[in-house]
Amino acid sequence: MGRGLLRGLWPLHIVLWTRIASTIPPHVPKSVNSDVMASDNGGAVKLPQLCKFCDVRLSTCDNQKSCMSNCSITAICEKPHEVCVAVWRKNDKNITLETVCHDPKLTYHGFTLEDAASPKCVMKEKKRAGETFFMCACNMEECNDYIIFSEEYTTSSPDLLLVIIQVTGVSLLPPLGIAIAVIIIFYCYRVHRQQKLSPSWESSKPRKLMDFSDNCAIILEDDRSDISSTCANNINHNTELLPIELDTLVGKGRFAEVYKAKLKQNTSEQFETVAVKIFPYEEYSSWKTEKDIFSDINLKHENILQFLTAEERKTELGKQYWLITAFHAKGNLQEYLTRHVISWEDLRKLGSSLARGIAHLHSDHTPCGRPKMPIVHRDLKSSNILVKNDLTCCLCDFGLSLRLDPTLSVDDLANSGQVGTARYMAPEVLESRMNLENVESFKQTDVYSMALVLWEMTSRCNAVGEVKDYEPPFGSKVREHPCVESMKDSVLRDRGRPEIPSFWLNHQGIQIVCETLTECWDHDPEARLTAQCVAERFSELEHPERLSGRSCSQEKIPEDGSLNTTK
């Protein structure tokens, strides 16, 4: 049917396109893109105009009909609101043509730019002593390249417009008919399929752990977040700042302070609670790094802190840089473990969500299959992990993170430096011997740090029996804020790792967790598990019958139940 319709309409297409060709003027300025682009939060941002910019030069153009500027230089205007201008002058000696950018609010050669909003550069004669003077202004890309002196070139033929409408309508008929037919068929199929599905079958259908569609839904909307998804993952490009009222200081780090704040809604009584991370002027680079990480729409994940916007603010204390994110009342993981003893179910949820967040960070694609830039955190620790209301983790504080761009050279990676918190640094980071030829080595350092955080969780789980007060990894073996040299002694010289008491292994699930974290803090980076493998291990913990057939690692726990914690 579609082919027959196209064959029948083909002669009409030829006639209509012939009519269009006969109505086109000798020269039509090239079409341009719009000079605005949509911002992430729905506003519009004015882009600087592209104009011919050759100042004053000799010209062979006369003031009859139209001509080209013959200017070979295209410039980006300095200010977004500037327009393109052309000035044609003739005196007793020569003819000159001038093409520039100019602010339409200001006069040029003593004349106002009356036609600054015009899409074409239509010359208008101005009175000047001793010379013939024409000037035009226009607001389209390179519109001052085509100079028009005659009014007959400034408007399109009514016949041309009519013919274009006719040929467009005829051209769209076949695909429009096919599209409508496909929609009707798909709708009928869905209705028929839903009628066949029994409600009882739907309710008894077992829910999968997490399939492809579940992961895609997480990217579209995170219902478990403490902030409405309509605000999420936007950059505030508008000059008007968000109506935010700072409340209380809830955290302070090396680079910034974190405040609980109120984001006011349409009425003064309504607000949403948000977190505002404020960087001083001196820490611009940390703010920019974190802003650039958050700006990647593919970063969005249920176990990554939900981002709202980034702003630059001027205060009485000077210039500040803000990151505005979701607020999580339970605080960071270190604070939560200090205050609470957790159950086995809590440990499984916290550990699983932590591994999923890191796996997403490290991945080169989203759960939906879209390409994504892999990112390494480089400062993973319990104080940089937040606890959500449903007792799952989300990663935060990306000020030291690194995007593993394939265009980065070995020198670029080497210049990224020895960063992180000494207590959580992997052995190869402590002694600066990372394999810069392989970007996977950066991910392996995150996995080591993750193992220490998993140990912290396990040490506060009541499933292991006696639960001691919270201690960070390596506890009293090092001072409260150890330096790199003291951690070298413990981790490199002594090959020390946090202690795993034998009674922890009496619980089957804890035994698997201990085996997993031991493989993750292996001294050899290449022997460590990946974050994705750890996430799969935790998923298997929901199904004890699967534990004997793990695919990530075939290594079994020794029969005596002991684990080597000093690899």
Swiss-Prot record:
Domain of life per record:
Eukaryota
Q: Which gene encodes it?
A: Tgfbr2
Active-site residue numbers: D379 (proton acceptor)
Recorded catalytic reaction(s): these are: L-threonyl-[receptor-protein] + ATP = O-phospho-L-threonyl-[receptor-protein] + ADP + H(+); L-seryl-[receptor-protein] + ATP = O-phospho-L-seryl-[receptor-protein] + ADP + H(+)
Q: This protein is called what?
A: TGF-beta receptor type-2
Which range is the signal sequence, renumbered to this chain? 1-23
Q: Which residues carry this modification: Phosphoserine?
A: S409, S548, S553
The record's SUPFAM superfamilies line, in alphabetical order, gives: Protein kinase-like (PK-like), Snake toxin-like
Q: Which CDD domains match?
A: STKc_TGFbR2_like, TFP_LU_ECD_TGFR2
Positions on the Extracellular side per record topology:
24-166
Which GO BP terms apply? aorta morphogenesis; aortic valve morphogenesis; atrioventricular valve morphogenesis; brain development; branching involved in blood vessel morphogenesis; bronchus development; bronchus morphogenesis; cardiac left ventricle morphogenesis
Q: Name one Pfam family in it.
A: ecTbetaR2
Protein purpose? Transmembrane serine/threonine kinase forming with the TGF-beta type I serine/threonine kinase receptor, TGFBR1, the non-promiscuous receptor for the TGF-beta cytokines TGFB1, TGFB2 and TGFB3. Transduces the TGFB1, TGFB2 and TGFB3 signal from the cell surface to the cytoplasm and is thus regulating a plethora of physiological and pathological processes including cell cycle arrest in epithelial and hematopoietic cells, control of mesenchymal cell proliferation and differentiation, wound healing, extracellular matrix production, immunosuppression and carcinogenesis.
Record keywords:
Apoptosis, ATP-binding, Cell membrane, Differentiation, Disulfide bond, Glycoprotein, Growth regulation, Kinase, Magnesium, Manganese, Membrane, Metal-binding, Nucleotide-binding, Phosphoprotein, Receptor, Serine/threonine-protein kinase, Signal, Transferase, Transmembrane, Transmembrane helix
| Transmembrane portions of the chain | 167-187
Q: Which GO terms describe its cellular component?
A: caveola; external side of plasma membrane; membrane raft; nuclear body; plasma membrane; transforming growth factor beta ligand-receptor complex
Disordered, as annotated region: 545-567
